[in-house]
Amino acid sequence: MLQCAPKKNERLRGSCDFCTQSKLRCNKNKPSCRRCTLQQQPCVYSVARRTGRPPKHPRKANDCQEANGQHGDQDPVTSTPGGSYQQQSNHLLDVEGDGANFTLADASTTAQGRETAASPALDNALLVGETFGFSSLLDDPLIQSDDFFSFSLCMPPGEKEGHMASPRTLNGSTGPCSPTVLSSIDVPHLPARFGFLESSVESGLHGRTRPHLVEQPDKTVPSSFSEIEKIYDEGLTFSGLDSAINAVTNNGKGEPNISGTMAAHPHSKRQCFCSTSMSKLQMLVLHPTLCQKNSRARFDMALFLEEVVFSIYRDVLQCLVCQSKSLHSLASLCICTDWVIEALRDVAQDLSSGQDNLGGFRAGLYPPKDKFSICVGRFVLDDQLRESCTRSLVRYRLRKLIPIMDTMMKLNHRGAGGALSQAIRTMVEDVHHKIESALGMMEL
């Protein structure tokens, strides 16, 4: 009589207990395996505890189908609160093509962020590192706050604050590939205390409707409205491309609205925003007011950019995504650092020659009578004290940048041998020479 097959709960393991505990391969020879026979010990096969996949319950599927049938008469667009946003996301996905690497569900869940799908060409450019180097969210509250991209005019007392035109009023094109669709960032502006860069914009925008309320800009500042409109269009396009690059880097997730996301949520998905920080810095450094020939940057603007460079450098080293592995990022940061040191060296030269470039450098509500004075509230520094404070401040800022360049040189040794690595080494040595010459000039 044939023996029936054992039940599921009575089946034995394939390997004996001794081989299983010793993590050795068992030849599964029952009743005694080869290893247990050689060692002359009992070979025990325990009952297998593994169970199969639990059976499916078709009743739940039927319940879901019935629930879908009850709500089938409703419009899916009007029934959901985010229907209008899903239509907009569909439009963005259709515009960018089939190369987007995130779905419509991801776009609907992050409705507050900037959702921009990127094409495979941008993805390849980011991986190769041809145009942009790297992407960290600044810890500086000035950069993170909305005031960094808001416009606050410096009007005389008693006048109402003006309102800056939106990007859509400056850029007439509203096509699917226009910068307006690519980016939801407002036109980049400086805070109110850096209002000297906005005098030309104020005169150009308000010159059509009413007499402008600010002083005439210098000759080095562009004053025509067409030139200003071109500058804003270029900046808006740059911001749109930066949004697309962040979408590729972070798998379609835009820049978070809450500051310090990486520090507050260390276990969340890794996101890199170093390119956003570098883009903001480059847009300031390449501002037409700062890059004119035969003109020097304002001292307060140089100090502001020095703080931004130091913050970006610190955040890039702490970034868990890029970890300062990109030579393009080091080159971009080295160029911006070189510009800041050039501006500080100009201040040192002016101090050594008996002049200064402190026009308008003040912190307070009441402007000083002398435009070359430093005012803190109602307290105005005299010439000797002002020169001493300026020398100490410039010397401190220059010495603070020395360890930055030393670290750049150490990071550059990992990619030694290439043309870009050699260029970074040359730039770092040149910046070191500029710092030493400026410090020696101030000591003399």
UniProtKB/Swiss-Prot annotation:
Biased composition (Basic residues): 50-59
UniProt region (Disordered), positions on chain: 49-88
Record-annotated DNA-binding residue ranges: 16-43
UniProt cross-references to SMART domains, sorted A to Z: GAL4 (SM00066)
Any GO molecular function: DNA binding
A GO cellular component entry from the record: nucleus
Polar residues biased stretches: 76-88
The UniProt record lists the keyword Repressor: no
Keywords: DNA-binding, Metal-binding, Nucleus, Transcription, Transcription regulation, Zinc
InterPro entries xref list: OAF3, Zn2-C6_fun-type_DNA-bd_sf, Zn2Cys6_DnaBD
Coiled-coil boundaries: none
UniProt cross-references to PANTHER family, sorted A to Z: MONODICTYPHENONE CLUSTER TRANSCRIPTION FACTOR-RELATED, OLEATE-ACTIVATED TRANSCRIPTION FACTOR 1-RELATED
Further information: Gene clusters encoding host-selective toxins (HSTs) are localized on conditionally dispensable chromosomes (CDCs), also called supernumerary chromosomes, where they are present in multiple copies. The CDCs are not essential for saprophytic growth but controls host-selective pathogenicity.
Name this polypeptide is given: Transcription activator AFTR-2
Higher taxonomy: Eukaryota, Fungi, Dikarya, Ascomycota, Pezizomycotina
Gene responsible for this protein: AFTR-2
